[in-house]
């Protein structure tokens, strides 16, 4: 009987440094919590591995190319915690050749309507970032399919 490989899924969170280091620390913490919960759930066939927050096109491209080269990487899960400029993802996505799952959701289950402020808004712009990057995923896939 052939033994299956010990694959891993990479979890890559998109953001930007526009809102400062404190916001990026929260982004990293929220990403860590999501990865822990995914791994605890037992519903995925392989472990999810947290990658550093992706905030520049160079880091995004390098991360996707490292995923391409890593034989244990079964695919990448992306999530846009805060607004991540879609143009930063273009080259990395065009070069990426493995399965991709885009997690299109906010971190918080509930929106704190009574206490919401601009800090909360700036730290939780998944909807905007997800839409922009999802469109980029589509365009990169169309480009790759037409090669």
Predicted features by range, described:
Residues 60-73, 90-92:
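Short, well-structured alpha-helical segments in soluble
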Residues 86-96:
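Short Gly/Thr/Asp-enriched flexible loops that form oxyanion-binding sites at enzyme active sites
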Residues 16-32, 120-126:
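Glycine- and acidic-residue-enriched helix-capping/strand-helix junction motifs
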Residues 73-81, 102-103:
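Periplasmic-binding protein-like
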Residues 37-53:
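Short beta-strand elements in bilobed, periplasmic/extracellular small-molecule ligand-binding domains
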């Amino acid at each position: 009987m052939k033994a299956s490989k010990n694959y891993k899924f990479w979890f890559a969170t998109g953001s930007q440094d526009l809102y400062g280091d404190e916001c990026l620390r929260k982004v990293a913490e929220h990403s860590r919590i999501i990865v822990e919960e995914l791994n605890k759930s037992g519903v995925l066939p392989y472990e999810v591995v947290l990658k550093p927050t992706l905030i520049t096109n160079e880091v995004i491209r390098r991360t996707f190319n490292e995923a391409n080269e890593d034989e244990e990487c079964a695919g990448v899960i992306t999530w846009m915690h805060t607004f991540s400029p879609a143009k930063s993802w273009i080259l990395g996505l065009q070069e990426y050749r493995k399965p991709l799952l885009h997690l299109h959701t906010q971190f918080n289950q509930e929106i704190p309507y009574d206490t919401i402020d601009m800090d909360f808004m700036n730290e939780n712009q998944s909807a905007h970032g997800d839409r922009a990057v999802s469109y980029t995923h589509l365009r990169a896939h169309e480009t790759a399919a037409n090669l």
